[in-house]
């Protein structure tokens, strides 16, 4: 349908925070005037947009629960309607699911569908003792037509044995719409089971050793994976790590590859320098809470960040 595009778009928002006892209620409503936006099929349409976000939480000694709901409808706000993916974004709408940090638990991560989605997430944290914490999270994301986009069940337990040793472990279940998130027509829903564990050992006041391991089981995409990491830290300046991601369950025996990485980091007041060898598989890479699809890569990588 033809239309005359608007060269100006107007946005506004309303938010409130209500606290009473252990209860906390946050709501936010943002709206955008009509402008040209791309739909899921890459066709421009003249549409207004809105986002409704609700967060209800309750906490008391040793227990907390949080319920979140997010409704997004055509709130794609960019410098140009022809920009796609992470290009030209003016605002940021967080995904309606848990932000995972382990390599395999974050391999299939959902990106907010700005054209339209409904997301529901609930999380509980229980501390039966000072040294033990149990966390359970569930999230469900679907489209306007109730098509399943993403679903996750996550449970983790963490225990501090003494001043030196801390152990955590858990299990994740994910159902992921790869056709939608990675633009792969005809791809089936990816269904995974991922157990994981992490051990931190403080050698002394300055030195520590951290070990991660996880395993992903799936019959879709590239099959099963194993992941391992060893990290040695000398506070507050140095960090060294080696890791391997092994695609041992690939249906093609010739592609059951190892993806090695070795990194070193130097921290200085206001400065952080990292460098190392990276071999990564194509897929979603999450860094600092931002997830994006990256190509396969094999080579040296350096980064420098500075605060002024």
Q: Where on the chain are the PLM-derived regions?
A:
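Exposed, low-structure sequence patches enriched in small/polar residues
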Residues: 3-308
């Amino acid at each position: 349908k033809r239309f005359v595009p608007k060269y100006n778009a107007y946005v506004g928002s309303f938010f409130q925070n209500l606290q009473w006892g252990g209860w906390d209620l946050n709501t936010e409503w943002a709206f955008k005037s009509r402008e040209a936006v791309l739909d899921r099929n890459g066709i421009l349409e003249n549409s207004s947009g809105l986002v409704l976000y609700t967060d209800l939480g309750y906490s008391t000694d040793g227990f907390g629960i949080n319920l979140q709901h997010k409704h997004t409808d055509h709130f794609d706000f960019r410098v140009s309607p022809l920009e796609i993916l992470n290009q030209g974004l003016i605002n940021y709408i967080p995904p309606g699911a848990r932000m995972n940090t382990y390599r395999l638990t974050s391999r299939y991560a959902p990106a907010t569908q700005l054209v339209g989605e409904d997301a529901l997430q609930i999380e509980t944290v229980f501390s039966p003792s000072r040294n033990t914490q149990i966390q359970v999270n569930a999230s469900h994301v679907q489209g306007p037509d109730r098509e399943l986009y993403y679903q996750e069940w996550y449970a983790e337990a963490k225990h501090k044995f003494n001043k030196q040793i801390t152990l955590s472990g858990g299990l994740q279940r994910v159902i992921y719409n790869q056709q939608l998130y990675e633009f792969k027509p005809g791809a089936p829903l990816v269904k995974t089971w991922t157990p994981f564990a992490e051990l931190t050992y403080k050698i002394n006041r300055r030195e520590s050793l951290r070990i991660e391991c996880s395993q992903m089981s799936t019959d879709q995409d590239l099959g099963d994976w194993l992941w391992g990491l060893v990290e040695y830290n000398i506070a507050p300046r140095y960090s060294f790590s080696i890791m391997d991601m092994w695609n041992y369950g690939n249906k093609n025996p010739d592609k059951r590859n190892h993806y090695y990485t070795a990194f070193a980091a130097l921290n200085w007041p206001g400065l952080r320098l990292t460098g190392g060898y990276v071999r990564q598989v194509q897929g979603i890479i999450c860094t600092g809470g931002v997830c994006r699809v990256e190509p396969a890569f094999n080579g040296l990588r350096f980064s420098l960040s500075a605060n002024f």
